[in-house]
Amino acid sequence: MDWERPLTIYDEVPHIDYTFRLADGSITTWDDVYSQRTLGIAECLEIASDNPQCVYGELRNPQDRWPNGYSYEALQAPIGYLPFALADIVTIDEQGDHYSQIRQLRFVNVGLWLLFAAAWTLLIVQVTSHRLAAAAASTIVALNPLLFDRFTYVTNDGPAIIASTATSAWLIFGLRHRTLSWPRTIIPALAIGTIVGLLKPTALIVLLPILLAGWASARFADSRRPPMRWWLSVILIGAAGAVASFAYSAYIEARSSLDFHTVLSVILPRGPLGLADASVLRLEDISELVTGSGARNDAVTFEWGLRSPTVWVLGFAVLGAAAFLVSLTLRSAAFDRIPALDARVLGISVVVGFIAVLIAHPALHYVRGEFLMPFTSGRFQAPLIPLAGLVVLPAFLRFRGWAWAAIVGGLLVAAFAS
């Protein structure tokens, strides 16, 4: 992991600019352009300058950096950036060299990864008590390059994955404990939805497979029907998240002289692609679901962070995919702690969620007449990976040797071949 690599050409620059503004006590609006500090760090890392004064060595024109200098993450609420802003306030010397500043910002992801591990633990203990299978599934999830990469640069993607995993844990907890009172169901649902909506609304994508799994398990897998209050909690989380997100967007629009569409026309300047061309871009995205976001460019580095995965990492990914498919074929795939949820149904629901995002993301741009840039929607699907990790549990319970192979192989890959 190279903590001092250049910033990604797409999102890390505005994410960092947002962080710096938040640390200074302000909120990014559509009028804002990149600060001199952001421009300096980005340029100095790109040219690998060895000058410790490079960041403030000269005055830089924001319009020289795509897209015309706009700090375009104004659509994001500040919650997901708070860990990075806190690090900037407490530990980072603003006058320090570019390497030390970016290293300390990115190192916040170590703490976020530990929070994700805690959220994942809360999720997996809801469905199984078998430690070996849980350890194998945890290894598969932790080494997924699409997920792990979200914790390697300055972005709100990592906090969004933590929030979506915790949300999944809460909803599955609700399926297990059907006697929760209405207040203990509704109040947390409203709070969770509001927080996720103000963190990153795309984290709410986990609601789709959970809803499908809850409905289909009762209908097709001889499972008990979830209580009405559980259905209401899922709906309230989604509704509260949507309301919070739209309210924040309206607040930012009111504070800005420019609007979202003006800035978007600079980011996505060409319009519209033909349906066939847009579909080809989606085919390229499919490869990225397995190999990570650097696959389409045959690049040495990911767009978002890590080096392109080695053949051993890809081989381990194939092992995880095989376990996923085997679980879908087992006759008995109920989770031991929650028989009401069938792993086969959950697996199919996760696949439906992946495909829905794969289609919905470009379709939205296509319908609006915007040019679809060659970036992956995989980062929006990453919150579904922990749910996919639950699906492999029946395979590892049935084939214990396979579970040991996943654990030992995963540790070897992480230590020597990643």
Predicted regions and their residues:
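Transmembrane-helix signature of polytopic, membrane-embedded enzymes
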Residues: 96-99, 120-143
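Membrane-lumen/periplasm interface segments of multi-pass, membrane-embedded glycan/lipid transferases
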Residues: 247-332
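Perimembrane helix-loop-helix junctions
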Residues: 176, 206-242, 330
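Transmembrane-helix motifs of polytopic, lipid-linked glycan transferases
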Residues: 100-127, 166
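Interfacial juxtamembrane loops and adjacent helix segments
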Residues: 23-106
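Specific aromatic-rich, kink-prone transmembrane helix
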Residues: 119, 159-179, 192-193, 387-388
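Membrane-interface alpha helices of multi-pass inner-membrane proteins
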Residues: 184-201, 206-212
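Short acidic/glycine- and proline-prone juxtamembrane loop motifs at membrane-interface regions
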Residues: 146-160
